[in-house]
């Protein structure tokens, strides 16, 4: 972020703070008792004992000593009329004097008119006040947010179970000054400037408003150059349009700069504050603030002539407006410190008002709320047998389905139903015979807006009108005469109704209704409340308690919010996040974590801050055996040539990495090392000037600062790395790595000296490359129960997620604890098999428990994730089933903590944790535990013993090696490689390929000569043998592996002519042991695995999934091993005749994962041929056996060795196109000369090649298999059985 927005943001915040301080300073002593001096008539109630409400003042002892209703039940209330609108800052209560009657909890509602009540809330929750525990003590509550009202009601929720409801009350506050203007929807106020144009660099506009209409302009101003500012109600929300000096933008074609609020057409006061400094602006509606940057080219707002309030009048056309005017009341309207309404009341010349009055007219509207989807209903009487029927009302809801109206027509002739189904109105009329008709109208009527419904019927014609639409359809009912009935059920039906007076084919309605008319007569809902009209169940009368659960939007990371009356839901599709509120990232935080989960190389999305605000970024993870590299590409990694630039017009290239600078900084800061390769070529072009002069080329990094140093050197010096080391090979080339993390990544390169004759330069900036996760292995050890780490307070009001690894041998201990005044959070291991997550957000303590079937104090790493949001609380331990608890639909939901976060202990220094904790995340933020442990007694940085937990990740004989940060897998004694020894090493063998491993010296198979397990001595006869190999071939018979013992004894693994596996042991001249595995033909171009192990005389053979066992005779003596051969045995002297048959064509196919005891001969040949006792003859090509399974096997029949420049023509194929002419002689001469020339060249190449690699006879190639591979796969040679020496054969 540049410095200007930072400065303007600070100024905006300062201005906002001063503004609010000014407002609160006027009410500094607003705590006077307001009820003590009220007359008895100011007190009223839902019901009372004789005159009890008039003696309900605090500390009052007269009369009955306080208020008690006739019966203690729900929906009772005590009301105070404070005479005028006042500011209420506190309340206090007592029980009824000298009794056992008191209220233990209650809520407050307030109103300006005594109707259309509003519930007192904190945040988005209806606030419950703690009441009394006896009759005489006073319980005082300071309101977190002051309210302004004339009427206030105390509504008891719970009371003494051994008594009744009893209350004495007091209200504290002060006088409230208010300037009000009433707009009738056809008028406006004009504030005219003293000069033509009002130009402002900063603005503060504040007001309050109330309205029953969802649309209307509150204020507007514009200038001739495109400046404009407009605040407009749109569907019950406030849209702000603000533009600075952009003539292209027009109000009708631009989108709002900000939209805030919801359900603002509820006839309650709503506050608005707009603060602007330059292009930075804060827009606040009812304590919800949105910060934004304005459109436009300048910092000044230029408004011409006037500002209009309440509408946008058309110049020279009085009474004409561009948009719908505002209808309602505006209070305390200030524009840059000017009280606009006060000026209008005093008829100042700057103000023009048309039909604006200065008192707020309050419509006497009584809304009702249907609370319960099963039991809410309202019964109102009709006038029976009137010719026709007329019903109208307004409703608003979030539910798609619900019964709106059910009535039985006069004399039981039929039924009329009005249903909301799938957000559409459905009118259904049936007669007693079952004939019916229906009408559908509207869609998405569950959008929370007020909708008006009017049903008019006369005789055989019914009309349903929605939202005053004149094009509403009419229904004809020739089979039914419609007459008004006795009863009208709104919202639902009573449970005890047994006849057809009320039918409900769908669930009850949840929502609000108002303005109910039956037979063109309004219904008095206050009379319903008092019990003198109709009947009801589970209604809130005289208030609409609709709540927009999607505002503010608690779906994080762009999740889409939908809602019903009681709940909201988040659609997290295409966000990269999951969970009830789209809080949890589906991606890992680094390549290290992907590696830990078993991934190797590929493109991955990395979310550096987890559940934090930063979006995931795509990177390339390359997991090698020693480092895990993370690569981020940018938009120009190719070599780029530059000409024609100079200091006045330099060449500039901006680099785009596909993410924000915040994302890149998080990746870099979380890595151990980062680098970018920089290459610069030049000709007649300077890179640097003098060591102190201005450079001709430079680059900028993350903070937009110039950096004149280049690859391999240090920040601050105009040098390059090879110049420092005096190793520059070319004067015109500078190549090196930038590795100072605070300056990376390179975001821009500037070159300014390529405009001279024949002058040019070229540059290349490589991708950003990093390795090492600084946090994943960040661990601490707690050695005493009293030790803990201090972390700043965990601020997680709406969402909290905590994750970490731990290991311990203790029986119990507290991992984390954070306290608040009333709230707390604690995570602990309560026993060796139980983890508890305890939390209290104000609704009482709640505990989640996960029980483990295995002990958690086994000194192994275990993972814990605890999460709490406003919808649910969850606890995960390892991969065990999670524990979950849904949040209450109503009640407190803000987690407010104020103490420090204790890690590894508690504030009481008891029940501390003994063991290790690592990789602690708090709402995605990484906590550097090791750094804090350095200055904390009883806590030690780091934790050893990673291999105890993760050693199992090293597979196929790999050995886990402990490191300070994490671990590595040593694959020395494994035929596999890779970070987890999971990558097989395989190669293609041709008919002449032979790999021989000699057991003569204790040669290691890797460069690590200290590993003695990698060799076998020639004079040692192994008591145990283990052989593993995988193969794929289409040739049979063929030899797979040959072990040469002393005295012409051997072990051979081969495929017989029918493709079955055969293992031959020859341990003496007199006797051989032959084991034949009678399975299907294994020469079927599929990968098969052979495992053979011998322990003394016990032999086991596994072919794929089949296992066989055998015992050698006790007199058998096993021989020492001299060599191991894969493929063709080239020294055939003394070779067993049957083995010789299989060896005739060698092995053509693929071998992989070959291992004899701790020897991996194929790995030695392909990876460590220069230091291993291995010899390769013929062509050996590294490849993957699995990739060959479905390959095309119809290739060319000839395979060439790379050491021979020409292949031989197949002897069985005749030559063609032979020319019989006199030119044959000339051609022959040319051929002979050519042949001799190539022979000489071949001898020279062969000689040089032998000088270079004398230990090998042929070249190995590491490449993909060639297209001509499968020529020999088609060869099938029929070898006759030959009599051999006496053998023991075992057919298994």
UniProtKB/Swiss-Prot annotation:
Cytoplasmic side: 1246-1292
GO biological process, one term: cell adhesion
Domain of life: Eukaryota
Segments traversing the membrane: 1225-1245
Keyword Signal attributed: yes
Role summary: May play a role in the correct development and proper functioning of the peripheral and central nervous system and be involved in cell adhesion and intercellular communication.
Family listed: Belongs to the neurexin family.
Annotated protein name in UniProt: Contactin-associated protein like 5-2
Lineage of the species this protein comes from: Eukaryota, Metazoa, Chordata, Craniata, Vertebrata
């Amino acid at each position: 972020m540049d410095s200007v927005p930072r400065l303007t943001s600070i100024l905006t915040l300062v201005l906002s703070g001063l503004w609010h301080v000014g407002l609160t300073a006027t009410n500094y002593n607003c705590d006077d008792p307001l009820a003590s001096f009220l007359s008895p008539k100011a007190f009223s109630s839902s019901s009372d004992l004789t005159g009890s409400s008039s003696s309900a003042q605090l500390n009052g002892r007269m009369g009955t000593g306080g208020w008690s209703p006739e019966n203690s039940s729900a929906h009772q209330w005590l009301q105070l009329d404070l005479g005028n609108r006042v500011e209420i800052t506190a309340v206090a209560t007592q029980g009824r004097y000298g009794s056992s009657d008191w209220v233990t909890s209650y809520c407050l509602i307030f109103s300006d008119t005594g109707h259309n009540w509003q519930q007192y809330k904190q945040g988005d929750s209806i606030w419950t006040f703690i009441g009394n525990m006896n009759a005489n003590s006073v319980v005082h509550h300071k309101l977190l947010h002051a309210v302004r009202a004339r009427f206030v009601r105390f509504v008891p929720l719970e009371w003494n179970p051994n008594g009744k409801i009893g209350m004495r009350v007091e209200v504290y506050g002060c006088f409230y000054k208010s300037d009000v203007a009433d707009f009738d929807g056809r008028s406006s106020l004009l504030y005219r400037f003293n000069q033509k144009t009002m130009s402002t660099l900063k603005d503060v506009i504040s007001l309050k408003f109330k309205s029953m209409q969802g649309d209307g302009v509150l204020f507007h101003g514009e200038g001739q150059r495109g400046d404009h500012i407009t605040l407009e109600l749109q569907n019950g929300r406030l849209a702000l349009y603000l533009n600075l000096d952009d003539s292209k933008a027009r109000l009708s074609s631009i989108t709002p700069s900000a939209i805030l609020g919801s359900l603002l057409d509820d006839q309650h006061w709503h506050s608005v504050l707009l603060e602007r400094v330059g292009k930075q602006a804060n827009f606040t509606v009812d304590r919800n603030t949105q910060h934004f940057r304005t459109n436009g080219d300048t910092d000044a707002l230029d408004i011409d002539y006037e500002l209009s309030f309440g509408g946008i009048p058309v110049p020279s056309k009085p009474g004409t407006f561009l948009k719908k005017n505002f209808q309602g009341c505006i209070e305390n309207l200030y524009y840059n410190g000017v009280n606009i309404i006060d000026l209008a009341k005093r008829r100042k010349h700057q103000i023009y008002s048309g039909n604006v009055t200065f008192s707020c007219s309050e419509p006497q509207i009584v809304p009702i709320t249907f609370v319960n989807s099963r039991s809410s209903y309202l019964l109102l009487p009709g006038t029976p047998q009137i010719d026709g029927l007329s019903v109208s009302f307004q409703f608003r809801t979030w539910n798609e389905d619900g019964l709106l109206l059910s009535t039985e027509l006069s004399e039981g002739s039929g039924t009329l139903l009005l249903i909301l189904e799938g957000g559409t109105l459905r009118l259904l009329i049936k007669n007693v015979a079952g004939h019916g008709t229906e009408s559908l109208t509207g869609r998405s009527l569950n959008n929370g807006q007020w909708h008006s419904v009017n049903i008019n019927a006369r005789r055989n014609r019914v009309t349903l009108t929605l939202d005053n639409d004149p094009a509403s359809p009419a229904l004809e009912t020739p089979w039914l005469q419609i007459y008004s009935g006795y009863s009208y059920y709104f919202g639902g039906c009573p449970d005890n109704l047994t006849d057809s007076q009320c039918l409900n084919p769908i669930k009850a309605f949840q929502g609000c209704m108002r303005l109910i008319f039956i037979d063109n007569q309004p219904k008095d809902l206050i009379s319903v409340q008092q019990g003198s009209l109709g009947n009801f169940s589970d209604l809130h009368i005289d208030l609409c308690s609709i709540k927009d659960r999607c505002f503010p939007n608690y779906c994080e990371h762009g999740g889409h919010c939908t809602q019903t009356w009681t709940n909201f839901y988040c659609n997290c599709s295409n966000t990269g996040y999951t969970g009830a509120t789209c809080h949890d990232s589906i991606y890992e935080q680094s390549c290290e974590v992907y590696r830990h989960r078993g991934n190797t190389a590929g493109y991955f999305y990395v979310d550096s801050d987890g559940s934090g605000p930063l979006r995931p970024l795509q990177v390339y993870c390359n997991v090698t055996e020693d480092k895990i590299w993370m690569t981020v590409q940018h938009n120009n990694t190719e070599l780029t040539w530059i000409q024609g630039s100079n200091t006045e017009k330099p060449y500039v290239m901006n680099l785009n990495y596909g993410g924000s600078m915040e994302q890149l900084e998080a990746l870099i800061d979380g890595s151990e090392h980062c680098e970018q390769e920089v290459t610069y070529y030049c000709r007649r072009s300077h890179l640097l000037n003098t060591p102190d002069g201005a450079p001709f080329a430079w680059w900028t990094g993350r903070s937009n600062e110039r950096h004149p140093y280049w690859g391999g050197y240090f920040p601050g010096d105009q040098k390059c790395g090879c110049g420092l080391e005096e190793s520059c090979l070319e004067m015109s080339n500078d190549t090196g790595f930038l590795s100072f993390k605070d300056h990376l990544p390179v975001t821009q390169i500037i070159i300014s000296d390529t405009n001279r004759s024949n002058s040019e330069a070229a540059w290349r900036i490589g991708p950003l490359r990093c390795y090492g996760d600084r946090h994943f292995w960040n661990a601490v050890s707690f050695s005493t129960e009293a030790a803990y780490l201090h972390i700043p307070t965990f601020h997680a009001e709406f969402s909290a997620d905590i994750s970490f690894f731990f290991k311990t041998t203790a029986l119990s201990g507290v991992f984390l604890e954070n306290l608040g005044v009333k709230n707390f959070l604690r995570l602990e291991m309560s026993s060796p098999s139980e983890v508890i997550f305890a939390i209290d957000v104000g609704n009482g303590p709640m505990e989640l428990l996960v029980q483990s079937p295995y002990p958690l104090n086994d000194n192994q790493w275990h993972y814990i994730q605890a999460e709490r949001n406003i919808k649910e609380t969850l606890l995960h331990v390892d991969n065990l089933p999670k524990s979950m608890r849904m949040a209450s639909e109503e009640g407190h939901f803000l987690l407010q903590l104020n103490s420090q976060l204790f890690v590894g202990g508690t504030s009481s220094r008891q029940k501390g944790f003994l063991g290790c904790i690592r990789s602690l995340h708090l709402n995605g933020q990484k906590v550097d535990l090791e750094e804090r442990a350095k200055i904390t007694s009883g806590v030690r940085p780091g934790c050893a013993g990673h291999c105890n937990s993760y050693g199992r990740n090293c597979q196929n004989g790999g050995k886990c090696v402990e490191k300070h940060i994490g671990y590595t897998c040593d694959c020395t004694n494994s035929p596999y490689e890779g970070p987890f020894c999971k990558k097989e090493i395989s190669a293609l063998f041709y008919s002449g390929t032979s790999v021989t491993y000699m057991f003569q010296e204790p040669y290691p198979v890797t460069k690590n000569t200290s590993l003695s397990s990698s060799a076998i001595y020639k004079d040692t006869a192994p008591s145990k043998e283990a052989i593993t190999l995988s193969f794929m071939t289409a040739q049979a018979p063929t030899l797979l592996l040959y072990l040469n013992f002393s005295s012409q004894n051997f072990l051979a693994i081969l495929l017989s002519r029918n493709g079955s596996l055969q293992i031959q042991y020859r341990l003496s001249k007199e006797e051989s042991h032959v084991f034949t595995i009678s399975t299907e033909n294994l020469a079927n171009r599929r990968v098969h695995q052979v495992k053979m192990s011998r322990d003394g005389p016990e032999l086991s053979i596994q072919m794929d999934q089949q296992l066989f066992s055998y015992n050698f005779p006790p007199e058998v003596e096993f021989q020492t091993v001299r060599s191991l051969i894969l493929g063709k045995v080239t020294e055939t002297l003394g070779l067993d005749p049957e083995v010789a048959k299989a060896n005739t064509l060698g092995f053509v196919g693929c071998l992989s994962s070959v291992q004899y005891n701790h020897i991996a001969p194929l790995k030695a040949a392909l990876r460590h041929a220069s230091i291993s006792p291995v010899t390769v003859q013929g062509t050996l090509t590294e490849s993957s056996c699995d990739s060959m399974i479905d390959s095309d096997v119809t290739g060319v029949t000839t395979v060439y060795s790379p050491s021979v420049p020409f292949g031989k023509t197949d002897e069985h194929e005749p030559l063609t196109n032979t020319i019989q002419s006199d030119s044959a002689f000339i051609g022959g001469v040319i051929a002979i000369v050519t042949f001799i020339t190539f022979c000489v060249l071949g001898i020279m190449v062969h000689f040089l090649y032998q000088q270079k690699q004398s230990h090998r006879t042929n070249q190995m190639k590491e490449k993909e298999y060639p297209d001509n591979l499968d020529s020999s796969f088609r060869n099938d040679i029929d070898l006759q059985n030959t009599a051999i020496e006496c053998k023991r054969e075992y057919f298994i």
